[in-house]
């Protein structure tokens, strides 16, 4: 049943307090329990609801902000993982079971955005982000093809775990960045000059430079390493701080200089996070078996990509 749980902010640097990252009177609220592995929350402002994934149960769920009710958004859903919105407010989903990235149109139909690279099937797309130019970037580890639990066991046709870009005009899938062991969450800096990618198998977040044309220009450097767990999804707030779902360590908050400022401690393994709500100050947390939320003292970026 939905309710409130005590939450704990762990302050590791005084900037976590002075930056008002934590809201002292907020609670960690349990919105739903009953998933087998929750992932990919995305807030849909036009309808005031949240869609998220229950990967092993092969379904997308929907939580209504006004009523608190939960229902099935789509099932089967291709063992969905990460979700995001494009500039038109359409749902973009990484279907790791179907080994593809799709877009749900406003009429409910599903369009395949990417399922192959140079004629070879993708591994199991994990997470996606949309740049302001309309391009869709996604990570493609092999997590969904190593067993039948969250997808379908298969051999990798590509033979590597990469990050790809889908051109908004042509739909062409190109290699954006490589050299990862297990690329997972990805997000652009607020000015879109840097791309941050969590590598779950390497237990770190890598940051890469991006030029004016939207091309990655280097191999990147390590932004932060995860101690006592591994990174999954990552998000920025409006102040340029990076928030990371750290499996085994709650939610970590990093200063732009890479300093770990503090943590939100959650009573389950955390896989994915998303800012949402009318004021964009509510963090939704997809954990192992449940969906949580907490109101923070900071806000997230606009819900939809803004053309620069």
Regions found by a protein language model. Name each.
Residues 2-16, 24-59:
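Beta-strand-rich domains and repeat architectures in extracellular enzymes and scaffolds
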Residues 138-158, 296:
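Short, conserved, GDST-rich strand-edge loop motifs in beta-rich repeat architectures
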Residues 64-65, 87-88, 102-109, 113, ...:
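Flexible "stalk/tail and boundary" regions
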Residues 25-27, 33-48, 76-95, 100, ...:
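Beta-rich, blade/repeat-based domains predominating
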Residues 55, 96, 141-142, 200, ...:
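Short loop/turn segments immediately following the C-termini of beta-strands
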Residues 208-215, 296-303:
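Short loop/turn segments immediately following beta-strands, especially the blade-tip
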Residues 14-33, 67-76, 107-119, 162-182, ...:
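Blade-edge beta-strand/turn elements of extracellular beta-propeller
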Residues 59-61, 100-102, 161-164, 204-206, ...:
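A short loop-to-beta-strand structural motif that recurs across blades of beta-propeller domains
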């Amino acid at each position: 049943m939905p309710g409130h749980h005590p939450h704990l902010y762990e302050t590791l640097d005084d900037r976590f307090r002075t930056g008002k990252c934590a809201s002292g009177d907020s609670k960690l609220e349990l919105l739903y329990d009953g998933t087998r592995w929750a992932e990919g929350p995305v807030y849909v402002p036009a309808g005031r609801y949240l869609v998220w994934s229950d990967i092993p149960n092969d379904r997308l769920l929907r939580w209504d902000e006004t009523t608190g009710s939960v229902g099935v958004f789509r099932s089967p859903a291709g063992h969905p993982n990460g979700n995001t919105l494009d500039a038109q407010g359409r749902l973009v989903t990484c279907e790791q079971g179907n080994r593809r990235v799709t877009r749900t149109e406003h009429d409910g139909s599903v369009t395949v955005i990417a399922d192959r690279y140079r004629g070879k099937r993708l591994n199991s797309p994990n997470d996606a982000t949309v740049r302001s130019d309309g391009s869709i970037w996604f990570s493609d580890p092999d997590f969904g093809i190593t067993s039948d639990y969250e997808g379908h066991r298969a051999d990798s046709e590509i033979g590597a775990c990469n990050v790809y870009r889908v051109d908004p005009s042509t739909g062409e899938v190109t290699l954006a960045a490589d050299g990862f062991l297990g690329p997972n969450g990805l997000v652009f800096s607020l000015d879109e000059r840097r791309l941050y990618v969590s590598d779950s198998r390497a237990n770190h977040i890598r940051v890469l430079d991006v030029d004016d044309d939207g091309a990655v220009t280097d191999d990147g450097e390590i932004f932060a390493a995860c101690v006592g767990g591994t990174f999954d999804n990552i998000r920025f707030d409006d102040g340029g701080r990076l928030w990371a779902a750290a499996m085994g360590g709650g939610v970590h908050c990093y200063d732009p200089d890479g300093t770990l400022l503090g943590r939100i401690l959650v009573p389950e393994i955390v896989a994915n996070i998303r800012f949402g709500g009318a004021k964009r100050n509510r963090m939704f947390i997809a954990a192992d078996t449940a969906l949580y939320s907490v109101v923070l003292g900071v806000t997230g970026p606009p819900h939809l990509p803004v053309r620069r």
